[in-house]
Amino acid sequence: MRGLQGRFRSAQSYRNDSLQRDSLRRTGRYFSFPIRGYATNAIGGIHGEGYRANGFDLFDYKARGSHPAQDIFVADRNQNSLDDRTSQPVDILSMSNGLVIGIETAWTSGSEYRGGNWIWVYDPNLHGLFYYAHNSAVQVVPGQWVQTGQKLGEMGRTGFNAYKTRSPTHLHLMYLQIQPDGLPIPLDTYPWLLTARLSK
């Protein structure tokens, strides 16, 4: 990751990273709301309470009980992955500038993986990873640089639990902050979503 970080960010002392990250995260202009045509009232729960990081382990997909993410819901009562208001797919947008480092596009209903069709984007300014899950379509490829607000894919119902009728159609959005020792630690994106730029 350090190689990627060095390639895609301005040359600054590593000891200033936390100050720079804190500054960027406080300004709403840095982030784009990740769903076109929707706003903060689409975020699940009250005041972001759906976020639960306790027990999270990125390297153990069988770990249960945590939910270190925000779910953002859309109007899709018939669960066909189309917006009830427009009868069109719902665009998933990149929250920030970054490098696509991984995607999944071949999820099937027989798979036990919970994320379905997902996208990982590395933000070298924040030195962290954004994870966008449950997409019906992925329209970026690994190695592609994306801009804030750029379309990554389309919302769907892929994933072990997300495709079931009990689950409303939503984006599962997670952010992992990479620590100096290289381990990823989840951070709540709710404050960023509240100030993010909206896209029509």
Language model features by range: what are they?
Residues 70-84, 128, 133-135, 175-187:
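Small beta-barrel nucleic-acid-binding modules, principally OB-folds
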Residues 1-91, 95, 191-200:
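Polar/charged, compositionally biased leader and regulatory segments
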Residues 1-5, 10-12, 141-150, 154-157, ...:
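Acidic, glycine-rich catalytic/binding loops that coordinate metals and/or anionic ligands
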Residues 85-89, 93-136, 166-170:
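Zn2+-dependent peptidoglycan hydrolase active-site motif and core
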Residues 72, 98, 149:
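Divalent metal-coordination and catalytic microenvironments
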